[in-house]
């Protein structure tokens, strides 16, 4: 009798296990095998949780890294320290920031390619090789476009909650900096290429400082010299008498100077009489922004933005809560 009960129990347990397995399979089968990803060029069907992902856009790579998502191929490029692990041999070098290596892509057979910014011009060609999305970020809509990228990537891998938490953190940190940035006296944002300086106005490439954080600019788009027009020099800077000077060092960011010449650090270039004659120079309010975080990343990756916010917050607080 006992033996019959034991056998019946085993049969029931086996049936229950089969039923549970069937339920799990049915739940998995109900999941769509692909996801529609909306991006700057439209929408693309992407396989759920892709593993062979090639990322040409560094801001998207920032988001992938921050969310802990798999990456198989990256461009050969200067990387900020927190992305330096992608220079390891286990990652396929898929080209440069501007030009894909089509042979490398053919060997890798990616199930997703991500472009943006510098690589966005290759979208049409790459989309013929594999599902491709363009996560380019507009300078005047940085948070909106970052949210689109983070939300799309998190959704591909079932990490929606993590994506929402990340964007909540970014928005919170940006909001905490805005009062300090907006109260700071007007300043000038300059991109430096050795001793050549180029002013940057609101609404342009590095609009994060003015358009997102609300810092005041002494210059408008009309004040910025047109390409091929008269150069803007240190004498012009001295005439403006800015309270704040923000500097993005292009050569330090890229690790190269035009024509293969020597790199002269901006800290050395800006150590001159004209800068010292300005209120910014006299108050120690010449801010050398993180070169890679601003020039390469454009402040538009989540970690890049958080780091750049932290630097500016520290600067403004040291200057007296951003009121100088």
Each language-model region and where it sits:
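N-terminal secretory signal peptides and thylakoid transit peptides that target proteins
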Residues: 2-17
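C-terminal segment of N-terminal export signals and the immediately downstream linker at the start
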Residues: 4, 22-34, 43-44
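Proline-aspartate-enriched helix->loop->beta-strand connector
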Residues: 109-115, 131, 241-246
